[in-house]
Amino acid sequence: MSEEKKVVLTREYVVNLRRAYEVSRTKRAKYAVGLIRRFVARHLKVESKNVRIGQALNEVLWMRSIEKPPRKVRVVVEKLSDGTVKVDLKNV
């Protein structure tokens, strides 16, 4: 039987993705996903492999193709009881 995962911590961040524009155009959106993973892992003290990116956030990052991700995004981060972290787009 699987145990119910409870939310231990919830935070909101504005992640600046400006550094993604320092990478070549054909790698920017993928690099932006990595930037978010590393940012969240650093701030919540978990490994980056335990960070899960939500579908809505992923679609926003890739919406204007691989060459033009957004400059910054507002995210909601939830740390679960099993140590994984969910990152989703903040509903405005």
Swiss-Prot record:
This is Large ribosomal subunit protein eL31. One of its GO terms (molecular function) is structural constituent of ribosome. Belongs to the eukaryotic ribosomal protein eL31 family. InterPro entries: Ribosomal_eL31, Ribosomal_eL31_dom_sf. SUPFAM superfamilies: Ribosomal protein L31e. One of its GO terms (biological process) is cytoplasmic translation. GO terms for cellular component: cytosolic large ribosomal subunit. It holds the Pfam family Ribosomal_L31e. It comes from Pyrobaculum arsenaticum (strain DSM 13514 / JCM 11321 / PZ6). Keywords: Ribonucleoprotein, Ribosomal protein.
